[in-house]
Amino acid sequence: MRIDLTFFENLPPTSPVDMRECILAREVYEYSTFLALEKGDIESFERNFTTVKTYYDEFDGILPVSQKKFTILGLYLLYLLSFNKISEYHTEIELIPIAELSNVFIKVPMSLEQYFVEGSYNKILSSKHNVPHPAYQFFIDKFIDAIRYEVARSAERAYESIAMKDMQGLFMLSNQGELSAFID
């Protein structure tokens, strides 16, 4: 479908027909963003997000607001957090108008970042079960894994040895099987 977009002659829109083409193009990239995430293809996710964000930013006030806009923006913020791209995360947050910061899809990554700064790892774990869209689970899991790896690195330096039961609690895992999978 993205190849077919190259046949659209009028981007940006200058007539109602052009506007329909732009809306269709935006939707193709939105769905491509979700599809890339579903496939676990982070590079495609980044590419599609970058393209669809152009439609959100450059055509603001020209095209109607997409119903998927905040879901996708929130996903991108989660991506930045989960891959420890903190300065880029803060740059993106600053670009979001204040009125839109209260959107549920934007609040999730903002809350996670706040919990992380506070060291409230239990709140991060509990937020795993309260996602506003199923696609958020992918990056929340990545974020939790990243935290666990940081805790593991610190524990490696701090302890000469540690009991498996204590390690399970330290890494916020609910059972021995999860701990074994994490260690592997």
Q: Which residues are covered by each model-predicted region?
A:
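Internal amphipathic alpha-helical repeat/solenoid segments
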Residues: 1-28
